[in-house]
C-alpha cells in the first residue's frame, strides 16, 4: 500500500466516524430526551432493563454514550447501582446493530432484489432526500431526519472507501503475517482492546475490522479474539467519565468493565475448550462482514444470558473494589442532577435543570412566606435565621444552575429545549431576587424588634393585606413555573397590577397619618422599605409568569407583553384585576 492508499484509508475512517456521529446525533435529537426519561423510570425489572438498554443504544448508536449516561444517573441518584447492571448489559447488545447495518456492504449478487439491499443502491437517494430536508425545510423534525439520512450515507461511503483502500493489502505478506499473529487469543484481545480504547467506540472498531475483511486475509481465528478485546476496550469511555464522580457512579463503570471482562474470559474459555475437543472448521475460513456481526452479537447475547442472573455478584465485586469510607462526609445531593455527563444528552439535561429550578422555586416561596410571617406576627429569631439561610441557599442554586445552563447552552439544542433553557435562565434570576427581598423584609422586622417599634393598628391591618396579596402572587408564580400552567401564569399580571394599587394607597395613607402625627418618621422609613420590597416581589413574579407565556411562542419581550396586556380592551385582564382589588381591599380608615 502506497501513501495514497494510506490517505484513502484514513479519509475513509474519518468519514466513517463522522457519519456515525452525525447519524447518532440526529437520532438523539429525534428522541428529544424521551429515551433517557424512559431509561430513568423503567429499570426496576432486570429483563426490562436489558431490553431498554439495548433499545436506547440501538437508537443512539453508541454503547459508550448509554453507559456514560447510566454512570450519570447513578451519580445523581436517579438510578440505583442494582438497576445499572441490566442497562449496561443491554447496551452491549444494542451496539451490535451497527455491525449488522455495516454487513450490508458485503452483499453480493446480480439478482435485482439483492442489489437493492446493497447500500450503494439506496444511499444516493437517502443523501438527496437528507440534503433536501436540511436545506429546504424549516421543520426541526425534518432537519433531524435529514441528518440521520446524510449521516448514514457518509458512514456507508466511509466504509466503502476504507474497504477499497485496504483491499490491496491481501497481496502484502507483512499484513498477512500480522493478522496471523492475532490468531493468538491474547495478542488478538490486546489488539482489539487498544484499538477500541483509542477511538472510544466498539461500533467503529468492529466496522474497521469488517472493512479489513474485504482483503480476504482476516480469518475467524484472528477476528474472534479481536472482537473480544474490542468489547473490553469500550469500557475505557465509562471509566474515564466516572473520574471525580460518586462512589456508586464509579462502581457502575466497574460493573461495565467486570461484565465485559468476565464475559470474555468465560466465552473464550468455553469456546477454546470445545475447539480443543471438537475443532471448529470455520476458524480457518476468511471472515466476512456478516460473520463479524454474528460473532459480535452471539458473544454479547451469551454473556448477558449467563451473567444477568449474577448481576448481584458483579455489584458486590464493584463494591469490594471501591469500599465505603464511613468517615467521609455525605456529599451534598442537591445538585447531583446537574451532572456534566448529561450535557451529551441535552434534552435530558434541560429536564434536570427544570427539576432543580423547581426546587429553587419552592425554597423561594418558603423564604418569602417566612419573611411575611415575621411582619404579621411576633418576631421570631429562629425564623429570621431560617430566612437568611434560605437566601444563602437560593444564591447557591442560582450559581450552580446558571453555570450549568451556560455550559448546556453551547450544546446542540432543539428549538423547544433552547426556549425552555432561556426561560429557566431568566426565571432563576427572578427567584434569586425574590429571596433577596425576603431577606430585606426580615431585616426590617428585625430592626423593628430591636428598636421596640410597632406600627399603628390600622397600619398593621393594611400591611397584613399587602403581605397576603404578595403571598398569593408568589404562590401563583411558583405553581405556574412548576406545572407549566399558562392559565395560572396569566392570572399573575392582573394581581401584580392590583398590588401596585395597594402599594400606592398604603403610601398615601401613611403620609396622611404622618401629617396627623399618628406615625413617626422612623416607622415611616421602615414602612417605605417594606412596601418597596413587597412591590418588587410582585414585579419579579410578573416576570416569571411572562416567561412562561412568551417563551413557547418564541418571544421574550416582557415589557412589550405587559403593555399589550394592559392596553388591549375586551380581555379578562380588567375583570381579574377588579376581582383582586375587591379580594385585597384595604380596611377603611
PLM-predicted stretches and their roles:
Residues 24-28, 57-65, 166-167, 195-204, ...:
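Short helix-coil transition sites and intra-membrane helix breaks within transmembrane domains
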Residues 9-22, 53-57, 125-137, 150-162, ...:
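Hydrophobic core segments of alpha-helical transmembrane domains in multi-pass membrane transport
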Residues 1-46, 145-194, 212-215:
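Helix-loop-helix hairpins and the membrane-proximal interhelical loops
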Residues 69-91, 95, 99-121, 159, ...:
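Membrane-interfacial helix-loop connectors
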Residues 1-7, 109-121, 175-181, 221, ...:
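Interfacial loop-to-helix junctions that mark the boundaries of transmembrane helices
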Residues 43-69, 185-208:
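Hydrophobic alpha-helical transmembrane segments of multi-pass integral membrane proteins
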Amino acid at each position: 500500500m502506497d501513501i495514497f492508499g494510506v490517505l484513502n484509508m484514513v479519509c475513509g475512517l474519518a468519514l466513517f466516524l463522522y457519519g456515525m456521529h452525525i447519524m447518532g446525533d440526529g437520532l438523539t435529537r429525534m428522541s428529544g430526551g424521551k429515551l433517557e426519561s424512559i431509561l430513568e423510570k423503567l429499570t426496576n425489572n432486570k429483563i426490562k432493563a436489558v431490553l431498554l438498554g439495548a433499545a436506547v443504544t440501538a437508537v443512539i448508536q453508541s454503547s459508550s454514550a448509554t453507559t456514560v449516561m447510566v454512570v450519570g444517573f447513578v451519580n445523581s441518584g436517579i438510578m440505583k447501582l442494582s438497576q445499572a447492571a441490566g442497562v449496561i448489559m443491554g447496551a452491549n447488545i444494542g451496539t451490535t446493530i451497527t455491525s449488522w447495518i455495516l454487513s450490508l456492504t458485503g452483499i453480493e449478487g446480480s439478482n435485482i432484489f439483492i442489489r437493492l439491499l446493497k447500500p450503494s443502491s439506496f444511499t444516493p437517494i437517502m443523501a438527496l432526500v437528507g440534503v433536501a430536508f436540511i436545506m429546504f425545510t424549516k421543520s426541526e423534525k425534518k432537519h433531524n431526519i435529514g441528518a440521520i439520512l446524510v449521516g448514514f450515507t457518509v458512514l456507508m461511503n466511509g466504509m466503502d472507501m476504507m474497504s477499497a483502500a485496504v483491499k490491496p493489502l491481501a497481496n502484502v505478506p507483512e499484513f498477512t503475517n500480522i493478522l496471523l499473529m492475532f490468531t493468538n487469543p491474547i495478542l488478538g484481545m490486546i489488539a482489539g482492546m487498544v484499538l477500541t480504547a483509542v477511538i472510544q467506540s466498539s461500533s467503529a472498531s468492529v466496522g474497521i475490522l469488517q472493512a479489513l475483511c474485504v482483503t480476504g486475509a482476516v480469518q475467524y481465528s484472528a477476528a474472534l479474539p479481536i472482537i473480544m478485546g474490542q468489547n473490553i476496550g469500550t469500557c475505557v469511555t465509562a471509566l474515564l467519565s466516572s473520574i471525580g464522580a460518586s462512589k456508586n457512579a464509579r462502581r457502575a463503570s466497574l460493573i461495565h468493565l467486570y461484565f465485559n471482562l468476565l464475559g470474555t474470559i468465560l466465552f473464550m474459555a468455553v469456546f477454546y475448550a470445545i475447539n480443543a475437543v471438537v475443532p471448529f472448521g470455520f476458524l480457518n475460513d476468511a471472515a466476512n462482514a456478516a460473520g463479524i456481526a454474528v460473532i459480535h452479537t452471539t458473544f454479547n447475547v451469551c454473556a448477558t444470558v449467563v451473567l444477568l442472573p449474577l448481576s448481584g455478584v458483579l455489584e458486590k465485586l464493584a463494591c469490594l473494589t471501591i469500599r465505603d469510607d464511613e468517615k467521609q462526609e455525605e456529599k451534598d445531593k442537591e445538585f447531583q442532577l446537574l451532572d456534566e455527563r448529561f450535557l451529551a444528552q441535552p434534552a435530558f439535561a434541560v429536564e434536570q435543570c427544570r427539576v432543580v429550578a423547581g426546587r429553587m422555586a419552592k425554597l423561594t416561596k418558603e423564604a418569602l412566606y417566612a419573611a411575611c410571617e415575621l411582619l404579621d406576627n411576633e418576631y421570631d429569631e429562629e425564623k429570621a435565621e431560617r430566612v437568611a439561610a434560605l437566601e444563602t441557599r437560593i444564591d447557591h442554586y442560582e450559581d450552580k444552575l446558571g453555570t450549568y445552563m451556560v455550559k448546556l447552552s453551547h450544546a446542540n439544542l432543539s428549538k423547544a429545549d433552547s426556549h425552555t433553557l432561556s426561560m429557566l435562565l431568566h426565571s432563576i434570576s427572578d427567584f434569586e431576587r425574590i429571596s433577596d427581598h425576603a431577606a430585606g423584609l426580615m431585616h426590617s422586622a428585625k430592626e423593628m424588634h430591636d428598636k421596640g417599634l410597632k406600627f399603628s393598628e390600622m397600619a398593621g391591618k393594611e400591611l397584613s393585606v399587602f403581605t397576603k396579596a404578595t403571598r398569593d402572587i408568589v404562590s401563583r408564580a411558583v405553581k405556574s413555573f412548576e406545572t407549566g400552567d399558562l392559565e395560572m401564569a396569566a392570572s399573575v399580571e392582573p394581581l401584580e397590577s392590583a398590588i401596585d394599587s395597594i402599594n400606592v394607597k398604603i403610601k398615601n395613607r401613611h403620609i396622611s397619618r404622618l401629617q396627623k402625627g399618628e406615625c413617626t418618621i422612623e416607622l415611616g422609613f421602615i414602612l417605605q422599605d417594606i412596601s418597596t420590597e413587597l412591590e418588587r416581589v410582585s414585579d419579579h413574579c410578573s416576570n416569571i409568569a411572562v416567561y412562561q407565556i412568551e417563551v413557547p411562542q418564541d418571544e421574550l419581550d416582557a415589557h412589550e407583553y405587559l403593555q399589550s396586556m394592559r392596553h388591549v380592551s375586551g380581555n379578562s385582564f380588567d375583570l381579574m384585576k377588579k376581582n383582586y382589588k375587591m379580594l385585597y381591599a384595604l380596611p377603611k380608615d
